[in-house]
Every structure is written in C-alpha cells, then in structure tokens.
C-alpha cells in the first residue's frame, strides 16, 4: 500500500513538473511573439535559437521531431566528458551515433566600463543578463580597467580582484538557484615575445566549458608574457579583439552574435541628431565619415577620445568577425549602464536586438520629426558596400546608357533585382528609354542586394523639375533584413534633402513604413496612387493661401498640383 502511495505521489509530482515545464515553454514563446513586431522576426529568432532550449515536444520546422542529441544539454555533456577524458572536445563533436545538427553556443561579449555604475544599475544589468540567458544567449564579461596606471601591477591586481568580487556578489551567488553563476578568469592569454601583439589562449576549453555549464566567465585583462615569465595588463579593446580572434578558431561550436560595449558616455554622437547617438551605423559605408564628423568639434576633446576608441575598436572587431566567418550576422551595440538595466524587452536595446536583430527605432526616420525619439544607443554592423552614382561625381553625361557602357551599372543584375523585388517583369527597354536622360541618382547596395533609382521629373504645367523616387528595390531574400531598407532610404534622403516625391499603390502594405518617413501625403479619390513627399522645404513656413505669398515659404496648394501632375503622368514600368 505504501509503494502504491509513493507511486501516486511520484505520478502527481511528474505531472506538476511537466505542467511547469510546459508553462515555461509557452510563456517563453508568448514573450517572444509579444516582443517581436513581425511574424518574420519571430520566425527568424525561433529558427536561430530554438535548439538552445529543450523544446522536445514543440517543433518549428514542418513538424520534424527533434533528436534528443540535438539539444544543448546533450552537447554540453558530450563536450565536458571528452575534455575530462583528455580527448579533443572539438573532434567530430556532432558525429556520435548519429549525424547531429550543429548547435553553436550563441555568444554575446560584454566590455563594461564599470567605475561609475551604481548598485541599482548593476542589479538591473543582472536581470538583463538573466533574460539574455533565458533567450539562449551565453554572455562573456570583460571589465574595462583602462583607467588604472600601468606601472603598479600589484596594487592594480588587488583592486581588480576586489572590484570583481563585489560585482560577482551583485550578479549573484552560485549557491542560490535563481542567481547568475559567474567565474573569474585571469592570465587567460599568453604573449610569446615582448613585442608580440598577437595574444593567444592556450586553453580555450577553460572558457567554453563554463559556458556550456551556464556559467558566465568574467575575464581579467591580464596576460602572461612567456619571454619575461611575468604577468602584464592589456588594453581592454585589445582583450576584446584577441578574445574574438581566439573564439573564432572554433566556429563549429560557437557563433559570436553580439559585441556589446557598456559605457556611461553612450553611443557614437551625431550632429544630425543633436549630439545624441547614431541609431544605426553601416561601418563599410559610414566609418570614415563618422570619424571626420567626430573631429568637427561639436563634442569636448576628452569625450571625443573615448568615442573614437569605441568606434575604432568596434570596427576592428566586427571586421575581424566578418572576415573570419564570411557573413555579417554579428552586431555591435554601444549603450549606457542605465539603458542596459532597463527590464523591458521592447525598451532594452540589447534584448530587443537579440529578438529582432535591429535597433529600437529606424535609422531612416526623419530627425526633424518631433515623434522621432533621441537615443543613447548605437547599433553597428560591418554592413554592406554602397555605390552612389550621380551627375556631380560622373565625368560624362549622366545617362543610364553611359553607366551601363562603362560598367558602373550591371544592367542584367539591376533588371533581375527589380523583377525579383516587385514580383513582376520590368518592361526593360521601354523603362530604360524613359529614364535614360532624366537620371538623377542611382544607389546600389552590395552585389545588387538592393538599389534605388531617382529621376528628375518635369511638371507639365510649370516646367519645374522635381526629384522623384522611381524605383526602390530590395531582393526578396533580403526583404525584412534589418537595416538594409534603412541604409538605402537614408541615402535617398541625403542625396535629395531639399525635395523628394514618390508614389505607391493605395493598397501597398509598405505605405505605413513610407508614411513614417515623409512630411505629408496626397491621395486623389479617382487615382490608384498615394503620393508621398518630403524635404527641407517643408520645414519652412507653408503658404496655404494662393494670394498671400510668404517670402521663402512654400505654396502647398501649388506643390500638391505639381506632385499630382507628375505622378499621374508617369507610365507603368512593368509588363
């Protein structure tokens, strides 16, 4: 009878455990769906991170059941057992008994300038770390001690140990179940010679095994110099770069998802945004321009040095990751302790970027709009190359035929991109003949991953030429890709800041996106088109009365007639 009673208790306990686990899974998925703004974002996140969780009874890809060895816990056990048995943990890690799907650790590297971080902020940051782990991210923390003098190693070492222990106590004690588990790592790197700048990790497993056990490594900026047999401090940015370089030697077991700098001065400042941060930086295109901007003198020299160091370090690190992995999936984030401590998925830029792979607001939103918020966070990507073609920088007549003949534009790739983006066939010869002599600007991103064509269109009533966004195309595989549409549209607005118009069918779902980026819209009842307009001229006073002209103002009534005349008279481009 007692055995039966024990079995009954065990059965009830198992039911409760199953219910708890099921509820946890359901709550996780619901929180993901709530925090992402589109189905595509939710799907992309779940496809990328689903194997970081034990979703054994939930499938995301056509109902295919997940192999038990494909789960992170199984991989942890295999990895650790091999290491303890003095085997190479990285050899055929996915080939025991069955071919296993690769399940890399999803890493986020945090470089934290911690001196002025308050206790309250640390507590909030600890909650952010917990949320990141809950979402499948494995954090690594590097504390920035660059403010210490370089000639007093012993005193610095004691200070570092004391500060790290304080931070570990704030983040949580390993004995407490719900707290974060952390471990201090020092002398992780070795310098072979006195002048050697290339640092190496002799025992990478010492970093990876804690990560597989759910423990956060806190790495001290101390290196062992093999030639002098002494320990030395290293610059925190050099530490970040060397850590990335070492981790990327084992790309089959990990991926570096985020590189995060937590700094009280925040993201990279922008003149355009009233010295608040650049929202998104496409480093391949904007790096040199932003460096030049920082030297204009709109910020104090002492702050400029810090921002320059952050920008250079992020560019160097993201370039390394991009070169070694062959992709642009790693995101850089520079933000403040205050912002990292925000415990709201849609307001915390780090959490939001994990879920959506983009910034909280769009970088192409007009800075002049009151509804566009000002931020202290910059999102950075190595990004894509951008080619901007216009009459000012072209030695011959700026026609499409000339651009094609001298190889500046690949006609077949451009046509393929437009066909793919719009889902219908371009009437190629007719379209190119129409725009050949009226070309204003051509923007080509990457290997025709996206493009824009802007033309000069003439109003039949006033003969005034106005810039018209004729084609805005993004390859279907890249549609929804974070940042690409923003990169192109931002260039479009910068190329024609004074006045720009475009049209879109009234039932186009993209119209909401367009509406957020324009100064106004026009829609004639009998037309299939919605007309959008923007430009600096609309920041001036608007003269709404035909008979009373305001000097320097805009006759909005006349402009609407011009825009309507132009857009209604442009012939269809597709077959």
UniProtKB/Swiss-Prot annotation:
Gene Ontology biological process terms, A to Z: L-arginine biosynthetic process; ornithine biosynthetic process
Note the PROSITE patterns from the entry.
Answer: GNAT_NAGS
The pathway is: Amino-acid biosynthesis; L-arginine biosynthesis; N(2)-acetyl-L-ornithine from L-glutamate: step 1/4
Where's it found, cell-wise?
A: Mitochondrion
Transit peptide: give start and end: 1-35
Q: Name one GO cellular component term.
A: mitochondrial matrix
What sort of enzyme, by top EC class, is this?
Answer: transferase
The UniProt keywords, alphabetically, are:
Acyltransferase, Amino-acid biosynthesis, Mitochondrion, Transferase, Transit peptide
The UniProt record lists the N-acetyltransferase domain at: 398-557
State the InterPro entries in the record. Answer: GlcNAc_Synth_fun (IPR011190), Vertebrate-like_GNAT_dom (IPR006855)
What Pfam families does the entry give? NAT (PF04768)
A molecular function annotated in GO for this UniProt entry is:
L-glutamate N-acetyltransferase activity
Q: What is its EC number?
A: 2.3.1.1
Q: Which reaction does it catalyse?
A: L-glutamate + acetyl-CoA = N-acetyl-L-glutamate + CoA + H(+)
What is this protein's function?
N-acetylglutamate synthase involved in arginine biosynthesis.
Q: Which PANTHER family match?
A: AMINO-ACID ACETYLTRANSFERASE, MITOCHONDRIAL (PTHR23342:SF4), N-ACETYLGLUTAMATE SYNTHASE (PTHR23342)
State the family it belongs to: Belongs to the acetyltransferase family.
Protein's name according to its UniProt entry: Amino-acid acetyltransferase, mitochondrial
Q: Which gene encodes it?
A: ARG2
